[in-house]
Swiss-Prot record:
The gene is Segment-3. This is Core protein VP3. GO terms for cellular component: virion component. It holds the Pfam family Orbi_VP3. It comes from Bluetongue virus 1 (isolate South Africa) (BTV 1). It comes from the Viruses. One of its GO terms (molecular function) is structural molecule activity. The VP3 protein is one of the five proteins (with VP1, VP4, VP6 and VP7) which form the inner capsid of the virus. InterPro entries: Inner_layer_core_VP3_Orbivir, Inner_layer_core_VP3_Reovir. The lineage of its organism: Viruses, Riboviria, Orthornavirae, Duplornaviricota, Resentoviricetes.
């Protein structure tokens, strides 16, 4: 037993060479990390040069697998909550009166504590505060009532007091029996009625709720009551189409009983995804490419062909002098295998990833390696027609290498007639004078490479993703054909391969021609697999749109730079031979394949929410320019990013492109109309609609300065004073008379400060008992309650900050309007033992700041009005009902094994 429990030490690979004919096993996420590393090596060459003159940038390669896990967690997270009772919208403060209390709207009290203090010189903090307040509204209003507490009263179902949204239990002990009976009668009248929503029985009752929260709740309830049945049908139908394309059966196990009468279901996301949302993101082409690899690319092995092919064609003699025979027995190093991975990535993402040759003096000096690469390169890659796998430089180098190989006559000499231009392959060779000019690269027609005289891009039946309707057909192979590796490829051929065999025979390379003739079935299986991977597994919202794909080659030839430039990866000469001798054979489908549509929908939904946030923030500078004097579009971009989910930011910034996004990129993205519908987007838009009134965000620009004495009433009749529930506040019920208000703009304040008369001018206005308005700037408003004298910093606080200093014989003044403003409520409490002058001071206390907000934050009400705010209709689902989020059903089911694998 001890021997069985003993853990075996892991075998550590100490050699860069590989074992056997199976070279490696690469999964989608692993290949995405590898591709990201290689792409970043190219991208950061330019970025690093640019950043040497600016700030430091973290070039750490992110963990793609962790990012995908985080996005899956976002899909599982609910943007709403299921509760038994709604939050308390109104609370009451007990005074010494037996028939008057203070009713407080808790929404404004809570909202005043959300976010940071706004200042003029920190626009990013202002934007961040606005977003926090909007998210607070959305979060508090997004709830579903389920199994609410109720009681029976005379055969009627009556809601328990805590369900009504009004907190009044602290008031009951001080009330008279008559008042308590009156409130109890009102509570007994809170009858829960039976209703019907979308064929489901529900409870309907009247409660209290603050206006912004109720807007979100009402919009959310309307979303549920709309059933989303057509959206669900569209999503399931689209998933079935996608499953047919990707050979995946859609599983309906989650939807087994969602149509039952006791089921309430919520669909938070929708399919298909709007691809414009994903591709409109600035500088996102590389990030989308990496996501396509990570979510779709299958796990596979690099399989070598039958070794007898080379042994009976290239190395059948004892003495082998040909370039192919020399390289036949070589084994790749780890670095060379990395180049093989790059080659297959370029083949699987034609046009998006293109190859160039490394500057390696050792290999450039080895003519055998170059010549072999020149031959197999023309059979591996496509250079023109509709797309390319190569740069123009690499295509020319391969032409030169093929030229050298044809002229290298190591067996027998053949006749060569040279052309007049001196270009590579400008000659005719052999007895039949085969014209080798046809193998010189022509990106306009694809001549000389795999795209020569073949239809390698096809448009046929409509694809599930509307933006990528193309089907890739390397070597003219239809990806719908079933592949049996033992027989597939026999008797198949295509134009470039035939011409290569003819040219090799004409050049006297009979053994090499025999080798390629024997390799043809293996070669066709290789590209048949690649076609299937591209057209089935890699078909995704992250696939390059057709219009961008069609523009890649013309832009490359013309040297034009567009939004989706190709990524150039460097490979060695000898890696072309190793890539030709190995085929990427899929062994397992990608683990993310069935949930990829859900990941795409979550990502697109979050992007849409970010875009809506940025649109509204971009309008604020025009609405309140004085509070955003120093604001730039980059500020609201940063604010939205800071408050967005980390997983979404990580996907957008996979290639560290955020450090290089400019204002043009941002504004173009904000103004584009594409959005991905989802529950989160619906609630976010409704929250912004509620936030259009800045007073609902506890922000105001109506702040006044007026000298007002704190009331010090005589206590001649203590009983009467207590019954009145006396209190004082610096919040105005109406704006002051306009003819008594002096408006102080920034310009007036600065002018008087420069003249050294600012304080004197304010004093003169207040001595005349007039008002001074400091408007034009939004201020953060806090609400506080006191039952004793408030601190002096609140009583005598000014609605501005004014600092003066001297430097170098000059006087400097600094004025800021955007300061924190406090609305305070002072509740007077007296005892029967107090004397008439207990509240009177020798020197009066003055308050300086007055605030006007056109909202009822606090009201003094009679006891009979405590439940007068019950005016909102709520829908609650019965306890026997089940509430189910069926968003997780928007993923495909069982991956089918590829036929004949």
């Amino acid at each position: 037993m001890a021997a069985q429990n003993e853990q075996r030490p892991e075998r550590i690979k100490t050699t860069p060479y590989l074992e056997g004919d199976v070279l490696s096993s690469d999964s989608g996420p692993l290949l995405s990390v590898f591709a990201l590393q290689e792409i970043m090596q190219k991208v950061r060459q330019v970025q690093a040069d640019y950043m040497t003159a600016t700030r430091e940038v973290d070039f750490t390669v992110p963990d793609v697998q962790q990012i995908l896990d985080d996005i899956k967690a976002l899909a599982a997270a609910q943007v709403y909550k299921i509760v038994k009772v709604p939050s308390t919208s109104f609370r009451h403060i007990v005074t010494q009166s037996r028939d008057r209390v203070l009713r407080v709207d808790t929404y404004y009290e809570e909202m005043s504590q959300v976010g940071d203090v706004i200042t003029e010189d920190e626009p990013e903090k202002f934007y961040s505060t606005i977003i926090k307040k909007v998210r607070f509204i959305r979060g508090k209003g997004s709830f579903i009532l389920h199994d609410i507490p109720a009681r029976d009263h005379r055969g009627m179902e009556v809601a328990e007091p805590e369900v009504l949204g009004v907190e009044f239990k602290n008031v009951l002990p001080v009330l008279t029996a008559e008042h308590r009976a009156m409130i109890q009668n009102a509570l007994d009248g809170s009858i829960i009625e039976n209703g019907n929503v979308a064929t489901r029985d529900v409870d309907v009752f009247i409660g209290a709720c603050s206006e912004p929260f109720y807007r979100i709740y009402n919009r959310f309830q309307g979303y549920i009551e709309a059933v989303q049945l057509q959206e669900l049908r569209n999503s399931i139908g689209w998933l079935e189409r996608l499953g047919q394309r990707k050979r995946i059966t859609y599983s309906q196990e989650v939807l087994t009983d969602f149509r039952r009468q006791d089921m309430i279901w919520v669909l938070a996301l929708q399919l298909p995804v709007n691809p414009q949302v994903v591709w409109d993101v600035p500088r996102s082409s590389i990030a989308n490419l990496i996501m396509n690899i990570a979510t779709c690319l299958p796990t596979g092995e690099y399989i070598a062909p039958n070794p007898r092919i080379s042994s009976i064609t290239l190395t059948q003699r004892i003495t082998t002098t040909g370039p192919f025979a020399i390289l036949t027995g070589s084994t790749p190093t780890a670095q060379q295998l990395n180049d093989v991975r790059k080659i297959y990535l370029a083949l699987m993402f034609p046009g998006q990833i293109i190859l160039d040759l490394k500057i390696d003096p050792g290999e450039r000096m080895d003519p055998a390696v170059r010549m072999v690469a020149g031959v197999v390169g023309h059979l591996l890659f496509t250079a023109g027609g509709r797309f390319t796998n190569l740069t123009q430089n690499m295509a020319r180098q391969l032409d030169i290498a093929l030229n050298d190989y044809l002229l290298y006559m190591y067996n027998t000499r053949v006749q060569v007639n040279y052309g007049p231009t001196g270009e590579p392959l400008d000659f005719q060779i052999g007895r039949n004078q085969y014209d080798c000019n046809v193998f010189r690269a022509d990106f306009a027609t694809g001549t000389g490479y795999n795209g020569w005289a073949t239809i390698d891009v096809e448009y046929r039946d409509p694809a599930p993703y509307v933006h990528a309707q193309r089907y890739i057909r390397y070597c003219g192979i239809d990806s719908r054909e079933l592949i049996n590796p033992t027989t597939y490829g026999i008797g198949m051929t295509y134009h470039c391969y035939n011409e290569m065999l003819r040219m090799l025979v004409a050049a006297g390379k009979d053994s090499e021609a025999a080798y390629f003739r024997s390799m043809l079935p293996f070669h066709m299986v290789r590209f048949a697999r690649i076609n299937q991977i591209i057209n089935e597994d890699l078909h995704s919202v992250f696939s390059l749109p057709d219009d961008m794909f069609n523009a890649l080659l013309p832009d490359l030839i013309a040297g034009a730079h567009q939004n989706a430039d190709p990524v150039v990866l460097d490979v060695s000469w000898i890696s072309l031979w190793f890539a030709f001798n190995r085929s990427f054979e899929p062994t397992h489908r990608n683990e993310m394949l069935e949930i990829a549509p859900l990941i795409e929908s979550v990502y697109a939904s979050e992007l849409s929410v970010m875009k809506v946030d940025m649109r509204h923030l971009s309008l604020m500078q025009r609405r309140f320019p004085d509070v955003l004097i120093q604001a730039r579009p980059s500020h609201f971009w940063k604010a939205v990013l800071n408050d967005s989910p980390e997983a979404v930011k990580a996907v957008m910034n996979l290639s560290h492109s955020h450090n290089f996004i400019n204002i043009r990129d941002m504004m173009r993205w904000v103004l584009l109309p594409s959005l991905q519908p989802s529950l989160k987007l619906v609630l976010e838009e409704e929250a912004w609609a509620a936030a259009n009134d800045f007073e609902d965000l506890m922000l105001t620009d109506q702040v006044y300065m007026h000298r007002d004495m704190l009331p010090e009433p005589r206590l001649d009749d203590i009983e009467r004073f207590r019954q009145e529930g006396f209190y004082y506040t610096n919040m105005l019920e109406a704006p002051p008379e306009i003819d008594r208000v002096v408006q102080y703009t920034y310009e007036i304040a600065r002018l008087q400060a420069n003249m050294g008369q600012f304080r004197a001018a304010l004093r003169r206005i207040m001595d005349d008992d007039d008002w001074i308005g400091f408007g034009g700037v939004l201020r953060t408003v806090r609400v506080k309650f006191f039952d004793a004298r408030p601190p002096d910093d609140i009583l005598q606080g000014l609605p501005f900050s004014y600092d003066t200093n001297e430097k170098g014989g000059l006087s400097y003044a600094t004025i800021k309007y955007a300061t924190e403003t406090t609305i305070f409520y002072l509740i007077y409490n007296v005892e029967f033992s107090n004397t008439p002058d207990s509240l009177v001071l020798i020197n009066p206390t003055y308050t300086m700041t007055k605030v006007f907000i056109n909202k009822r934050i606090v009201e003094r009400v009679r006891v009979g009005q405590i439940l007068a705010v019950l005016n909102r209709r709520f829908v609650a689902y019965k306890g026997k009902m089940r509430i189910m989020d069926i968003t997780q059903s928007l993923k495909m089911g069982t991956k089918l094994a590829a036929p004949t694998v």
